[in-house]
C-alpha cells in the first residue's frame, strides 16, 4: 500500500477514535502525513509547526484543556526533541500521541541517513510504544491505533499519558496514481471501523470507612486534584488547602495561605489529611504529610499513586463525601484555621504594603486582580508567588507544568492552552479576555522561539516576563544562603542580557513594558489581539520572602 494511503488511513482512524488536534512538524519521512492532511484525511484541527520541541509543549497545553492531541515528526533527532514534553505529559498524566515517522526495518542499523533506533525511544515514560511496519490499511491497523488511543487516555484501567506510534514508510513518500485515476476499476476507499474502549469507573469508598472520625482534619489538593475536593470539604468540615494549579480554587471554598496553618502550632493539631492530586509546592505541606502520627488518606484513581513520604494509611481510587454530621470539634478547629488564614493575610498585606511594590509577589497580586481568563504560571517562582501572596483565585482556571516542574516550553504550553480554550484566531472566548502567562526571565528566554508559534497561531496571549535578573527561585532556597553573592550570580543566577522589545518585534508579537505592578494592571486592562510580550522588571526581595515565611510559621 502506498505510504500516503497508509498515512491517510492512520489519520482517518485517529479522527474517529477521538483525536482532536494534529500538530505536524515538517520532514521528508513524515511527508506522507502532510499529503494526507492536505487531502482532508483528518477532520479535526491540523496545524503545521516548525519546531518539534515547541509542538510537543503545545500538545501538553492542549491536553491540559481536555483535548487529545497528536504530534507528527520525522525520523532522527526530531523524535528526541519531544523528550521534555513527553516527560512532562507522563508525570502530569496528560494524554497525547507521538506519531514518529521512521525508515523501514531494512534501512535501520546499516548507516542510512537520518535513521536511528527510535522505536521505543521514550522507554518507561510512555504508556505504550507501538511499532507499525509498512502495511495495508486494515482492521488490524485500526486495532493497533485503538489500543494506542486507549492507552493514552488510560482506558480501560490504566493511567493517562503519552503514547508513541512509530510508523515506518517506504518510498515513494509522495502520492502515487491510483487505478481509478487511469480509468481502471475504482478502488474503494478505506473506511475505519474503530473499537471504542470505555474507561473503567472507580467505585467511591465511603468517607466514614476510610477517613473515620477526626477532630482536626484537612484536605490537601495539588495539581490534578479530584473535582470533588470542594464537596468533600463542605460535607466533612475539613478545611481545603489548594495549590493554584489544583483546580480546587474554582467555585471558592479553599482556605488561603495554607502554609500559615501547617507550619504553625495549629498545624501540629492535625490528626487526618485527605490528599488529592500531586502537592509539590510547599515543603511544610510535605513535612506534614510525612508525620508518622497522622492518618493520611490518598485519593488517586491511578497507579502509581502519589505518596512521596510513603506515609499513606490508605489509598482509594475515589471517595464519597461524608454522610455523618460535621463533628463539633472539627467545626471549632476549622473556624480557628479560617481565623489564622485571615490573620496571615492581613500580615502579608502589611508586609507587601510596606515594601517596594516591585516584587514577584506584588506582580502576582496585580495579575490576579486585573485578568479574568486562564492563567499559565511558570513552574518555578511564579506559581510559588501566587501560592504565597494571592488570597483567592475563585473561578479561575490555572495551569502550571508541575509534572516535572521544569522551565521548558512554557510559552509553547500557553499557546496550546490558547488553542484548546478558544483563545486563538477567531476566538470563541468572551470579548476582552485573554490567556495570561506569567514566567521568569530565564523561562521566557529558554522558550523564546515559541513566540513565533504564538504569532502564527494568532494566540490571544499576554506573556508577562517577571524579570528578576536570573534564577531568583534559588535565592529563596538554601542555595541563596550557602554561597557568596558573586558565586550565586555565576552559577545560579545566570542573568541574561536581552532586548525584549526587539525579541517581540523579531517574532511579530506586540510589546509593552511595565515598570511597576500598577502599570502592569493598566496594560492588562487594555487587551489586544494576538500575542503580546510584557517585560516587567521585579526585585528578588529575598528578605521579603523570608519575612512572609516567618508570618506563615
Question: Where is each model-derived feature located?
Answer:
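Short beta-strand segments
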Residues: 72-74, 95-102, 123, 133, ...
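Phosphate/pyrophosphate-binding active-site segments
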Residues: 1, 287-381, 508, 514-522, ...
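Glycine-rich, anion-gripping cofactor-binding loops and their flanking helix/strand elements
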Residues: 64, 75, 80-81, 205-208, ...
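Thiamine diphosphate
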Residues: 46, 88-89, 95-99, 106-119, ...
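N-terminal cofactor/phosphate-binding cores enriched in small/glycine residues
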Residues: 2-87
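Glycine-rich, acidic loop regions that bind phosphate or pyrophosphate groups
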Residues: 100-148, 242-344, 454
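Glycine/aspartate-rich loop-and-adjacent alpha/beta segment that forms the canonical ThDP
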Residues: 120, 157-202, 522-553
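Active-site diphosphate/adenylate-binding microenvironment
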Residues: 7-12, 28-34, 337-432
Amino acid at each position: 500500500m502506498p505510504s500516503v494511503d497508509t498515512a491517510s488511513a492512520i489519520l482517518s482512524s485517529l479522527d474517529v477514535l477521538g483525536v482532536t488536534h494534529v500538530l505536524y512538524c515538517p520532514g521528508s519521512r513524515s511527508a506522507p502525513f502532510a499529503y494526507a492532511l492536505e487531502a482532508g484525511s483528518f477532520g479535526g484541527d491540523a496545524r503545521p509547526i516548525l519546531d518539534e520541541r515547541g509542538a510537543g509543549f503545545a500538545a501538553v497545553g492542549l491536553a491540559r484543556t481536555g483535548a487529545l492531541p497528536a504530534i507528527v515528526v520525522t525520523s532522527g533527532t526530531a523524535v528526541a526533541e519531544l523528550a521534555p514534553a513527553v516527560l512532562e505529559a507522563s508525570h502530569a498524566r496528560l494524554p497525547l500521541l507521538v506519531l514518529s515517522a521512521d525508515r523501514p526495518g531494512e534501512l535501520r542499523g546499516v548507516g542510512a541517513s537520518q535513521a536511528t533506533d527510535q522505536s521505543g525511544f521514550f522507554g518507561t515514560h510512555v504508556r505504550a510504544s507501538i511499532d507499525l511496519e509498512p502495511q495495508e490499511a486494515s482492521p488490524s491497523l485500526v486495532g493497533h491505533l485503538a489500543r494506542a488511543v486507549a492507552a493514552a487516555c488510560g482506558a480501560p484501567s490504566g493511567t493517562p499519558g503519552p503514547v508513541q506510534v512509530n510508523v515506518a514508510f517506504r518510498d515513494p513518500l509522495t502520492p502515487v496514481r491510483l487505478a481509478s485515476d487511469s480509468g481502471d476499476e475504482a478502488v474503494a476507499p478505506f473506511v475505519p471501523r474503530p473499537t471504542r474502549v470505555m474507561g473503567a469507573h472507580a467505585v467511591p469508598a465511603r468517607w466514614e470507612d476510610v477517613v473515620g472520625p477526626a477532630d482536626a482534619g484537612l484536605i490537601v489538593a495539588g495539581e490534578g486534584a479530584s473535582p470533588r475536593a470542594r464537596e468533600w470539604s463542605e460535607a466533612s468540615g475539613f478545611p481545603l488547602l489548594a495549590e493554584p494549579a489544583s483546580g480546587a480554587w474554582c467555585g471558592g471554598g479553599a482556605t488561603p495561605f495554607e502554609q500559615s496553618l501547617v507550619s504553625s502550632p495549629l498545624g501540629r493539631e492535625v490528626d487526618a489529611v485527605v490528599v488529592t492530586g500531586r502537592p509539590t509546592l510547599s515543603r511544610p505541606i510535605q513535612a506534614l504529610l510525612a508525620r508518622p502520627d497522622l492518618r493520611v488518606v490518598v485519593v488517586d484513581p491511578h497507579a502509581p499513586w502519589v505518596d512521596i513520604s510513603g506515609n499513606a494509611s490508605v489509598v482509594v481510587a475515589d471517595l464519597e463525601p461524608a454522610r455523618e454530621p460535621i463533628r463539633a470539634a472539627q467545626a471549632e478547629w476549622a473556624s480557628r484555621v479560617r481565623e489564622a488564614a485571615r490573620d496571615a493575610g492581613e500580615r502579608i498585606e502589611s508586609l507587601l504594603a510596606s515594601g517596594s511594590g516591585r516584587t514577584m509577589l506584588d506582580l502576582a497580586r496585580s495579575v490576579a486582580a486585573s485578568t479574568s481568563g486562564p492563567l499559565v504560571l511558570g513552574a518555578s517562582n511564579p506559581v510559588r508567588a501566587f501560592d504565597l501572596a494571592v488570597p483567592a483565585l475563585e473561578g479561575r482556571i490555572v495551569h502550571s507544568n508541575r509534572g516535572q516542574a521544569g522551565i521548558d516550553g512554557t510559552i509553547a504550553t500557553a499557546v496550546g492552552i490558547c488553542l484548546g480554550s478558544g483563545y486563538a484566531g477567531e476566538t470563541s472566548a468572551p470579548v476582552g479576555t485573554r490567556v495570561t502567562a506569567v514566567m521568569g526571565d530565564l523561562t521566557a528566554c529558554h522558550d523564546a522561539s515559541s513566540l513565533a508559534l504564538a504569532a502564527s497561531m494568532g494566540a490571544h496571549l499576554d506573556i508577562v516576563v517577571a524579570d528578576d535578573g536570573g534564577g531568583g527561585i534559588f535565592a529563596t532556597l538554601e542555595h541563596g544562603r550557602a554561597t557568596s553573592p558573586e558565586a550565586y550570580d555565576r552559577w545560579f543566577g545566570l542573568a541574561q542580557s536581552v532586548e525584549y522589545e526587539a525579541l517581540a518585534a523579531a517574532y511579530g508579537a506586540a510589546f509593552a513594558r511595565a515598570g511597576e505592578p500598577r502599570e502592569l494592571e493598566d496594560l492588562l486592562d487594555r487587551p489586544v489581539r494576538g500575542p503580546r510580550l510584557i517585560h516587567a522588571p521585579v526585585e528578588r526581595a529575598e528578605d521579603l520572602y523570608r519575612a512572609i515565611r516567618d508570618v506563615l510559621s
